[in-house]
Curated annotation (Swiss-Prot):
Keyword vocabulary terms for this entry: Bacterial flagellum biogenesis, Repressor, RNA-binding
Entries under Pfam families matching the protein: FlbT (PF07378)
One Gene Ontology MF term: mRNA 5'-UTR binding
Entry's Gene Ontology BP terms: bacterial-type flagellum organization; mRNA catabolic process; negative regulation of bacterial-type flagellum assembly
Protein's organism: Mesorhizobium japonicum (strain LMG 29417 / CECT 9101 / MAFF 303099) (Mesorhizobium loti (strain MAFF 303099))
InterPro entries: Flagellum_FlbT
Name of the encoding gene: flbT
Family: Belongs to the FlbT family.
Residue spans crossing the bilayer: none
Listed name of the protein: Probable flagellum biosynthesis repressor protein FlbT
Function, as annotated: Has a post-transcriptional repressor function in flagellum biogenesis. Associates with the 5'-UTR of fljK mRNA and promotes its degradation.
Length: 147
C-alpha cells in the first residue's frame, strides 16, 4: 500500500492491524497512512469454517496476518499445502490463480492474497459440484494424500 487508505468501522467491529486486534466502540473512520497489514473482522474465518480446500488455504494465510508470531509456521504450512492443492484441482483458472497467490505471499502481500483466494470461492464451488457447504460431501483429494 503506497497511498493512504480510509476504512469505516461500525460500533463493536474489530480490525486486525499488524497483528494487533482493535475494537471500536462507535462508528469511526480510520486512515491508514503507511504500509500495514490489516484484515477486517468480516473477512476473518474460524477454523470450523475452513470446510473446503480454498477456505483451508485462506485460514492458513490469514494466520500470517493475524498472528505474526505464528507467521513462519503458517508460511511453512502454506508452502507444503499449495503444491498439493494445485495438483488437486483440474480447473486451469484456479491453478493459475493459486500460482499468483503463491507469488503474493512470497512478496508478503498477504491482504492481496486473501482477497484473491476469496475471489476463487465461486470457481471452487463449481469445481466441487456446488456441494462445498454440505458436510461429508466429496472434496478434491490432493495427490499423495491419504484418507
Amino acid at each position: 500500500m503506497t497511498n493512504t487508505l480510509k476504512i469505516s468501522l461500525k460500533p463493536n467491529e474489530k480490525i486486525y492491524i499488524n497483528g494487533a486486534v482493535i475494537r471500536v466502540d462507535r462508528k469511526v473512520t480510520i486512515e491508514l497512512m503507511n504500509d500495514v497489514q490489516f484484515l477486517l473482522e468480516s473477512h476473518v474465518i474460524q477454523a470450523d469454517q475452513a470446510s473446503t480446500p480454498l477456505r483451508q488455504l485462506y485460514f492458513i494465510v490469514q494466520v500470517m496476518l493475524i498472528n505474526p508470531a505464528g507467521a513462519d509456521d503458517a508460511r511453512e504450512m502454506f508452502r507444503r499445502s499449495l503444491p498439493l492443492l494445485i495438483a488437486s484441482f483440474e480447473d486451469a483458472e484456479i491453478c493459475s490463480a493459486l500460482k499468483q497467490i503463491d507469488r503474493m505471499v512470497g512478496e508478503d502481500h498477504i491482504y492481496e492474497a486473501l482477497k484473491a483466494i476469496r475471489s476463487l470461492y465461486p470457481l471452487e464451488r463449481r469445481a466441487l459440484g456446488g456441494n462445498d457447504d454440505v458436510p461429508g460431501a466429496p472434496r478434491p483429494l490432493a495427490v499423495g494424500a491419504r484418507y
